[in-house]
Amino acid sequence: MPVKIKIEHLTKIFGKRIKTALTMVEKGEPKNEILKKTGATVGVYDTNFEINEGEIFVIMGLSGSGKSTLLRLLNRLIEPTSGKIFIDNQDVATLNKEDLLQVRRKTMSMVFQNFGLFPHRTILENTEYGLEVQNVPKEERRKRAEKALDNANLLDFKDQYPKQLSGGMQQRVGLARALANDPEILLMDEAFSALDPLIRREMQDELLELQAKFQKTIIFVSHDLNEALRIGDRIAIMKDGKIMQIGTGEEILTNPANDYVKTFVEDVDRAKVITAENIMIPALTTNIDVDGPSVALKKMKTEEVSSLMAVDKKRQFRGVVTSEQAIAARKNNQPLKDVMTTDVGTVSKEMLVRDILPIIYDAPTPLAVVDDNGFLKGVLIRGSVLEALADIPDEDEVEEIEKEEENK
């Protein structure tokens, strides 16, 4: 994917003694000491990263980490102290007021935590507000607003007022209003934080559905790690105005960059994050369109296994061949496809470990990991699933758990 946003050495210091504060932060002095000695606050310091087009990029950190400041620097709601903000190779940090206004109106839209709806305007009028300030003709803006509301399943409520809607529905209106402008970039600041957990999850689902349809570039600020892991393609974790690590959820969980990140993610429920693709192992296969029983048995002996995944010439998954079945087929002069087990569990690469557990628990054979076209991508065994859930797994622990399950 092409790079949509590129940030170079972006810094924001609030206060008057900026040079002194910069010198102190360069020496590694903590944020609270800089504030105490200079009265200046380090918002963001020397930040560098790229965001790809069509990516959901989540910025997270504790309160005061600089995540919301960083978001507002992107559209210059907060002016940077130094650094560059490239959007499609144009440095937004150097734009004059008029050009910046056009970027805010046409390239970016923002969704806030507090909804930001006008109480005296109907839902439709709220949704078309951004188009109205752009002087879009009334008929066109109404059509675009209605389409955005329809995409958010809110068209039936277009003539109601914000106070008549629940918090979740009001936030959906805010999202519809942002999308009505057809922006290339969505900036979302703690957009779902004020919602109840169930409604928040529904909004996350809706955002992912809209993203699948429209493929916007989304920068999403959150303090909720589970939310970030659920919706983010990549995550940036901040502390004291600095980015500690950028990576996928899997990268951050399995390879934290430092002790701070390790502590930050240690309580996350790994079963809700890790997928089959992360823990599958290469599949040992036999091609049932080519291999006979003797070839299958030779492969099993070489690999020291008692079964093989059965695939056809196209490598589409067909079942499992055990050593007993292959021996019987050789004795009776049968092809493998006549004796193999076809009732074998399959999972997608994207399936979460928490959803895999009940499937693999009683499965008589390993699970096949397949793509949307049925092509075999790997295999899951019970041990690999258990290992994925362990904080610090070792082979002895996995074997012990497996024995306990077998004895139940």
From Swiss-Prot:
<dbReference type="InterPro" id="IPR046342">
    <property type="entry name" value="CBS_dom_sf"/>
</dbReference>
<dbReference type="InterPro" id="IPR051921">
    <property type="entry name" value="ABC_osmolyte_uptake_ATP-bind"/>
</dbReference>
<dbReference type="InterPro" id="IPR003439">
    <property type="entry name" value="ABC_transporter-like_ATP-bd"/>
</dbReference>
<dbReference type="Pfam" id="PF00571">
    <property type="entry name" value="CBS"/>
</dbReference>
<dbReference type="GO" id="GO:0016887">
    <property type="term" value="F:ATP hydrolysis activity"/>
</dbReference>
<dbReference type="InterPro" id="IPR000644">
    <property type="entry name" value="CBS_dom"/>
</dbReference>
<keyword id="KW-0547">Nucleotide-binding</keyword>
<dbReference type="Pfam" id="PF00005">
    <property type="entry name" value="ABC_tran"/>
</dbReference>
<keyword id="KW-0813">Transport</keyword>
<comment type="similarity">
    <text>Belongs to the ABC transporter superfamily.</text>
</comment>
<comment type="function">
    <text>Involved in a multicomponent binding-protein-dependent transport system for glycine betaine. Probably responsible for energy coupling to the transport system.</text>
</comment>
<dbReference type="InterPro" id="IPR017871">
    <property type="entry name" value="ABC_transporter-like_CS"/>
</dbReference>
<keyword id="KW-0129">CBS domain</keyword>
<feature type="domain" description="ABC transporter">
    <location>
        <begin position="5"/>
        <end position="265"/>
    </location>
</feature>
<keyword id="KW-0067">ATP-binding</keyword>
<dbReference type="GO" id="GO:0031460">
    <property type="term" value="P:glycine betaine transport"/>
</dbReference>
<keyword id="KW-0677">Repeat</keyword>
<feature type="domain" description="CBS 2">
    <location>
        <begin position="340"/>
        <end position="397"/>
    </location>
</feature>
<feature type="binding site">
    <location>
        <begin position="61"/>
        <end position="68"/>
    </location>
    <ligand>
        <name>ATP</name>
    </ligand>
</feature>
<protein>
    <recommendedName>
        <fullName>Glycine betaine transport ATP-binding protein OpuAA</fullName>
        <ecNumber>7.6.2.9</ecNumber>
    </recommendedName>
</protein>
<dbReference type="GO" id="GO:0005524">
    <property type="term" value="F:ATP binding"/>
</dbReference>
<keyword id="KW-1278">Translocase</keyword>
<keyword id="KW-0029">Amino-acid transport</keyword>
<dbReference type="GO" id="GO:0016020">
    <property type="term" value="C:membrane"/>
</dbReference>
<dbReference type="GO" id="GO:0006865">
    <property type="term" value="P:amino acid transport"/>
</dbReference>
<dbReference type="InterPro" id="IPR005892">
    <property type="entry name" value="Gly-betaine_transp_ATP-bd"/>
</dbReference>
<feature type="domain" description="CBS 1">
    <location>
        <begin position="280"/>
        <end position="336"/>
    </location>
</feature>
<dbReference type="GO" id="GO:0015418">
    <property type="term" value="F:ABC-type quaternary ammonium compound transporting activity"/>
</dbReference>
<dbReference type="InterPro" id="IPR003593">
    <property type="entry name" value="AAA+_ATPase"/>
</dbReference>
<dbReference type="InterPro" id="IPR027417">
    <property type="entry name" value="P-loop_NTPase"/>
</dbReference>
